[in-house]
Amino acid sequence: MRHKVGQRKLHRSTSHRLAMLNNMVTSLLEHQAIRTTLPKAKEARKIAERIITLGKRGGLANVRLAARTVKDRDVLQKVFGEYKDRYASRPGGYTRIVRLGFRRGDAAEMALLELVDRPEKAAPVDTEAAAPAEETKAE
């Protein structure tokens, strides 16, 4: 029986799902906002909230626990430095999900997952667009 199982499988194997969510959380903590589908955003939010809470607690053991999810050392330093100070007085609820409507290709519901109290200049990263960035030619 599947009583009280509170996790979405997202139509992926366990290793694929965990790797995808870890990468999404790392991108969220690095760029402070990501654009993705609503179910993925809801799952990534759970992990991101836990990582920020570990950052607020500090300590070597919590750094090692967070490093299991966030592999980027610069992002870890940001969590245990900048975010620790930013969210010191907030008892939880560090992220916000804003619904963006439906994607044109497959009608999947899109959402913006962002950190609250973030600077307005930070633009969201589109996790769905795999198109290469256009480079300007130096003339």
UniProtKB/Swiss-Prot annotation:
PROSITE patterns: RIBOSOMAL_L17
UniProt keyword terms in alphabetical order: Ribonucleoprotein, Ribosomal protein
SUPFAM superfamilies (alphabetical): Prokaryotic ribosomal protein L17
Gene Ontology molecular function: any one: structural constituent of ribosome
GO-annotated biological processes: translation
Name of one Pfam family that matches: Ribosomal_L17
Keyword Ribosomal protein applies: yes
Gene3D superfamilies in UniProt: Ribosomal protein L17 (3.90.1030.10)
One cellular component (GO) term of this entry: cytosolic large ribosomal subunit
Keyword Lipid biosynthesis carried by entry: no
Superkingdom, natural source: Bacteria
Similarity remark: Belongs to the bacterial ribosomal protein bL17 family.
PANTHER family assigned: LARGE RIBOSOMAL SUBUNIT PROTEIN BL17M (PTHR14413:SF16), RIBOSOMAL PROTEIN L17 (PTHR14413)
Oligomer status and interactors: Part of the 50S ribosomal subunit. Contacts protein L32.
Name of the protein in question: Large ribosomal subunit protein bL17
Source organism: Myxococcus xanthus (strain DK1622)
Lineage, opening ranks: Bacteria, Pseudomonadati, Myxococcota, Myxococcia, Myxococcales
